[in-house]
Amino acid sequence: MAGLETTPEMFDLRMSEEVRPLFDAVKKFITEEVDPHTNEFFRLGEGREERWGYGEGQLELLDSLKAKAKEQGLWNFFLPDAETGEGLKNLDYAYIATELGKNPIASQSLNCSAPDTGNMEVLERVGTPEQKEKWLTPLLNGEIRSAYAMTEPDIPSSDAKNISCRAILDGDEWVINGEKFYISGAGDPRCKIMICMVQTNPDGPPHKRQSQILVPMDNPGVEILGPCHVFGKDDAPHGHMHLRFNDCRVPKDNILLGEGRGFEISQVRLGPGRIHHCMRSIGAAERAIEMMVKRGLTREAFGKPIASLGKNIEVIAKARIEIESMRRMVLTAAKAMDELGNEAARVWVSAVKAMVPIRVCHIIDEAIQIHGAAGVSQWTPLADMYTSQRTLRLADGPDEVHWFVVGRAELRRWEEEGGIKYDPKADYYSEDSKTVLTAGI
């Protein structure tokens, strides 16, 4: 892999004309249907008797939004296969996902929530007809939720070769033992199935030791030890759960794609998933700057609007510039996936995953600052938005892994193209270099 590979076609970042009506319809649906009911959805969940359940009326409200979305054809459009979705290109979906990121329940309302989107794409691409009928169909219908179990408590899971949760074939069943934690969505009572990354061949080549297996949540061998907190919150009823597999038996046919092909599936799932996260993050940044500007223009201190005090106007300007630079990077990464394929575009995917969450964190932090104490209170969504983005710097690979992928690719590009041997003296101490350096001082 040599650097951030480009083609002339990748610089055309326009949305497809045939997708424009869908984009406009999604934007209108979120504004007219989802936004007016968002506060009510969360209000209904306050003071509920069952913490790992939903308040009276919550799911009914969400189901009504889903029904309206289905009626308008705004359903499963994230899938690249036109038989089950709209057949959108990654670039086209990037524009839509940005709108989804502006509202915390928009993705659920249109059946485009993580981790379901990644799991549905895996099942759609590599699932058997039986697996699709049993699990993909209810997911596509929005009838159930799902989880993806990869991270483990006792190993650095950023290197997936370390996966130690074992699955041993016993006759016609896989027997799974081990632990997983921070399994997002596993606390939701609607979560019925998870895709579990396990070690099936410990003596095989490093990238052929793992497999991915479908495990029903109600399997008696699955024990939920409790929620893993994120910034002091358990994120109920969604949750990020700590799971233990105790002689968990599942049918042999529950394996996806075949034994030892877990890494292949991860590339199918995690590449698009990382892009989707970054797309939604741009939407969160847009919401943060909107709140920042409105607060700055409507609040006064020392006889002036807050926006004009100190460096606040510079803060707003930098936020807008950063959003537009991130947007272009994410759109280019999406176009790279369309033009080059997921594997060839993985350096682009790592580039945006390393860049976007940390910059969006910074923008939300500035919005919090302009709001004062209200910025960290229950009266604005900014605190939750910040913790979500800060967590994203760890989810689907920490920043450092993605910086490494990009840096390594850049080094390889120079090695492959020029066989360069770097001599700093040749760069900085030649007569020409001295002239340039002096001119720059």
Pin down the residues of each PLM region.
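Alpha-helical interface subdomain recognition
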Residues: 1-104, 113, 126-131, 138-143, ...
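Long, acidic (Asp/Glu-rich), low-complexity accessory segments flanking structured domains
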Residues: 247-264
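A short core secondary-structure module
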Residues: 172-173, 177-225
